Amino acid sequence: MLPRILYMNPIEHVIRQAPAIEAKLGYTFKDPQLLVLAFVHRSFINENREVNQHNERLEFLGDSVLGMLISDYLYCKLPKTPEGQLSYLRSRLVEASSCVHYIQSLDLSGYLLLGKGERMNDGRGRESILADLFEAIIGAIYLDGGLQAAKDFLFKNFHQHIEIILATPLRNWKALLQDYCQKNYQQTPLYQVLHESGPDHSKVFQISVWIQDRELGRGKGTSKKEAQQAAAADALSRVELP
């Protein structure tokens, strides 16, 4: 069941509830206006002309901060994992469904300020809005307290979920990509060696994967097989998989 969205005296309500919101976040804002702004959806200001800012700029910033923090974490935690597989794991951790999980686990969606039309929408748009809210909160914390504050918030609250995703066995990316291409293009993907370097006993291959004259992804590895898997994983990081 979707949460009930509060709409009577909404800005004042969020301001009054700031301590409760901060307790759930585990972070206290120096500038409370950033906290309030994170909860203002564009549809709300369309119906409340006295409000002239919404959370999309914070969402834009938070998206980049979240991606950087997850990339840094994966790079340090998985030093031997190829680039393509890192890209796939990052996409799993920052995709909309993960962001929705993050925000729902904090039980903050009831404070979100929406216009009447969005409040009445019980479709998929709500998930997108909740994911945007999470990114806006990340952006607000980053602006208020810096990168370390955003990092502390993310990993203090969601480290367990991140570890569960990382513990999921890595898939056969080539087989998955082949199935995807056959289903959507009725063709199998083609792999092309772009570059190889290093001595014979320590080669590094860079390979791209193509479908219908369109490059889908690239990957590196110490063998062609490993590089192909990395390229397939990179390609799959850009599409939705079940």
Curated annotation (Swiss-Prot):
GO terms for biological process: mRNA processing; regulation of gene expression; rRNA processing; tRNA processing. Keywords: Cytoplasm, Endonuclease, Hydrolase, Magnesium, Metal-binding, mRNA processing, Nuclease, RNA-binding, rRNA processing, rRNA-binding, tRNA processing. It holds the Pfam family dsrm. CDD domains: DSRM_RNAse_III_family (cd10845), RIBOc (cd00593). Residues 172-241 form the DRBM domain. Belongs to the ribonuclease III family. This is Ribonuclease 3. It comes from Protochlamydia amoebophila (strain UWE25). The gene is rnc.
